[in-house]
Amino acid sequence: MASILKVDKIRVTGLDSDSISFDNSGNITFNKTVTGDNAAMVKLLETDVTSSVSELVINGTYINETYETYFISLSGAGSADGYRVHCQFYTSATQSGNGTIASGSNHGHGTHSMQDTGTHNSDTDTECRLTNSTIGNSTGEGYLLWGYLLGANRTDVPVQFMGQQTTFYTNGSQEACNFVGGMVTPGTYGAYYCRGIRLYHNSGTIETAKLKLYGIK
């Protein structure tokens, strides 16, 4: 037989206010801060850039064996007129450590504009290009992107970062784009763990940016 606990308030011993209270309809009010990581998405990192930096690096402190999939959002603006957003991956043959960026042409990418026939792709590159067209540096010009980092702990297929972005050309026009970037040479890097990602502009510096990283359960 099931037991039933009937209460209308829960208070921790020694406190002078309730932590949880219930009304006559069964609605719950939390009067104290709720913490923990039971949500499907767990925020791991939030970074605000307010002065020039050359790159944003998320290392093995955040991208490690804890999660298979990660969600990244990034918005920003650059110093150069006519830049693109690129990335590289830190990979490791072992689960521990921060990994290294592979030398040689072991990155691949593809971008496709939603507004015209513009595409760009390569499966033998030293970096991944995430934005299709060049981005301006006038007031209001910049980019916003989001993507899923997939397969961080798989050892049968290389890690990939895929998502969507919107940018503003050097003339202020908007472009929406799909992108995929990741490790290639699957015979080698399919067995490697991803232990970080480096985000940067192919010219100039990152002047302002907001970066968020979530682990996906």
Region locations from a protein language model:
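Surface-exposed molecular-recognition determinants
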Residues: A2-K217
